[in-house]
């Protein structure tokens, strides 16, 4: 499935972020 890289605009589709979650409309990496 197609997904967005961290830092990419995700709108209201958090499930499309690759190994990241949608925060403030952008994919944020879960790694710290």
Swiss-Prot record:
Cystine bridges: 3-18, 10-22, 17-27
Protein's cellular compartments: Secreted
Task performed by this protein: Delta-conotoxins bind to site 6 of voltage-gated sodium channels (Nav) and inhibit the inactivation process. This toxin acts on Nav1.2/SCN2A, Nav1.3/SCN3A and Nav1.6/SCN8A (EC(50)=1.7 uM).
Domain notes: The presence of a 'disulfide through disulfide knot' structurally defines this protein as a knottin.
Family: Belongs to the conotoxin O1 superfamily.
Miscellaneous field: Found in the dissected venom (DV), but not in the injectable (milked) venom (IV).
Name of the protein: Delta-conotoxin-like CnVID
Native source species: Conus consors (Singed cone)
């Amino acid at each position: 499935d197609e997904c967005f890289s961290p830092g990419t605009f995700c709108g209201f589709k958090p499930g499309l972020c690759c190994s990241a979650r949608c925060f403030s409309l952008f994919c944020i990496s879960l790694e710290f």
